[in-house]
Amino acid sequence: MEYFKRFDLKNPSVKEFFSLEDGKLRCIIIKFNSETEVLDYYIKGEKINEYLLFAEKIDKETFDKAKSVIDRLNVILRYNYFNL
């Protein structure tokens, strides 16, 4: 398995992390802005190259940290949603 990250220079509040395994790219995107948004989805096929074009390789530990941030944010967002 390979791990990557990419930051949007135009929007530094967006952080993107990817893991590539078995021809599928798992994308974890964290947006820190007025509303924190977390996206977690998979991409297959030719689109993978587009996503990895400006990405740099990272280690598993860094990717796992991004996953743990997402897990914590999802818990917080769910809690806030159900307690409005």
What does each model-found stretch correspond to?
Residues 2-9:
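A short beta-strand micro-motif
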Residues 3, 41-42, 51, 79-81:
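Sequence-level detector for tyrosine residue identity
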Residues 12-66:
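Acidic, low-complexity, intrinsically disordered interaction modules
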Residues 56-84:
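Charged interaction segments
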